[in-house]
Amino acid sequence: MWLLLLLPLWGGCAEPGDSEWVNLPSKCEVCKYVALELKSSFDETSRTRELIDTRYGFLEDDKKAKKIKYTNSDIRLIEVTEGLCSRLLEYNLHKERSGSNRFAKGMSETFQTLHHLVHKGVKVVMDIPYELWNETSAEVADMKKQCDVMMETYEDVIEDWYRHHQEADLTEFLCARHVLRGQDQSCLEEHWDSRKGDTGPSTGTKKQKKQGEKKNKSKKENSGPEEERRQMEQPTAAKEEL
């Protein structure tokens, strides 16, 4: 069975001024995902007890030098911020979504369907060749470009948050108070709705909870009938002693 489809779905082939094809991310949307990836990256690097030795070779006898926690070190801040914008290239454009939610990790529902048709032997004809279906869209490429500028411009703000204000929400601190101060902040109120194929940043909380539940469940299952009988006999034994 053959199906002929002519679908203009990819922003990569559009002219920069063609609003019907390309809807570049706003400053609000860029900051939202910069903050989201910063949170995720800081969370990923918070699960270590590694100590950093502040002494250098020619200062080995310096008794004042001491080890500091990696989680409080400049090294952690540099490692997180250095490759931050590259993480945005993991996002794809989901044109079936609206607002800032059109940016999400994972393949869009539309392209999942098209790939499924191709694998079933259906011929799908679009305005771009099949080999370019998974290329970075113009919108995502622009988001990465804006991120590079934003990270450089607000480097001091991010460092200030890291050193003195980690109790404050990073999206609120970076975007609402600084980057978007006096500007449109409506996208910050748009909540990310996970759908099939999406792989949003994970904090590990849910995973740890499930592992704990599984451990308790396994403990109950392994107790067996013998353990239940022993527990039932305990009150009787105590009564006989009295």
UniProtKB/Swiss-Prot annotation:
Belongs to the canopy family. Residues 210-242 have a biased composition (Basic and acidic residues). GO terms for biological process: innate immune response. The keyword Lipoprotein does not apply. Keywords: Chaperone, Disulfide bond, Endoplasmic reticulum, Immunity, Innate immunity, Signal. This is Protein canopy homolog 3. Toll-like receptor (TLR)-specific co-chaperone for HSP90B1. Required for proper TLR folding and hence controls TLR exit from the endoplasmic reticulum. Consequently, required for immune responses. It is found in: Endoplasmic reticulum. Residues 26-235 form the Saposin B-type domain. Residues 191-242 are annotated as: Disordered. The gene is cnpy3. GO terms for cellular component: endoplasmic reticulum. Disulfide bonds join C28-C187, C31-C175, C85-C147. It holds the Pfam family DUF3456. Residues 1-19 form the signal peptide.
